Curated annotation (Swiss-Prot):
Record GO biological process: lipid A biosynthetic process
Protein name in UniProt: UDP-2,3-diacylglucosamine hydrolase
Its job: Hydrolyzes the pyrophosphate bond of UDP-2,3-diacylglucosamine to yield 2,3-diacylglucosamine 1-phosphate (lipid X) and UMP by catalyzing the attack of water at the alpha-P atom. Involved in the biosynthesis of lipid A, a phosphorylated glycolipid that anchors the lipopolysaccharide to the outer membrane of the cell.
UniProt binding sites for substrate: N78, R79, D121, S159, N163, K166, H194
Major localization listed first in the record, in broad terms: membrane
NCBIfam families: lipid_A_lpxH (TIGR01854), PRK05340.1 (NF003743)
Gene Ontology annotations for the cellular component aspect, listed alphabetically: cytoplasm; extrinsic component of plasma membrane
Family designation: Belongs to the LpxH family.
Matches recorded under Pfam families: Metallophos
Cofactor: how and how many bound: Binds 2 Mn(2+) ions per subunit in a binuclear metal center.
Amino acid sequence: MRTLFIGDLHLSADRLDITQAFTRFLDTELDDADALYILGDLFEVWVGDDIALPFALELAEKLKQVSQKLPVYFIHGNRDFMLGKQFARAAGMQILPEVTCLNLYGIETVILHGDSLCTLDKAYQRFRKLRSLSLARWLYGCLSKKTRQGIADKIRSNSKSSNQQKSYTIMDVEPNAVDALFAKTHTKHMIHGHTHRPAIHQLANGCQRIVVGDWYEQGSVLSVSAEGINLQSLPFEHTT
């Protein structure tokens, strides 16, 4: 048996090929799985459970079927932090705290989306702090659907433009932030996404940091079992 970790699918109505690839993954890769963890940014944007698009509702039904066979866990990302209990319930997903520790076959491991580790990106961290406030989230939820969608589109556009001007270092995790989280959680193994740079990093003091990749051009899945770990790519099946 094995536990699977994915993240950064960025599903949207504009990229239904990714949704189709994810659906195939759910159909074919979970037979021997103990659990599925989705480490944030399942959707490209999420402005509220009351504005779920048809493709997202269909996906919720699929995930609900999966959840009847094995637990499905979800950690919010920077694109879908407004995903709430209503959609999670419909999808059979259990929402976890943004930093969660678990025992993986005898190994204490900390899992998270990963954006909190990119501490050199000061502008984003200020936005992240604001959006984490309960009052800010409540006020945003009180806005009309059209206004929320407009704000989300503007933020996404600004983020894309800003990221193109940021250096590789600023966009990656900051080593001191990684060390601090290891110390805070008393763990030596970490799994996260967000950076879209899949890799297995062997660090000092026997620590290990694993980054799951995005699903823009191919799938990325981390499999963890008692026998070891496997970070693999899943090619998309392109139809003509």
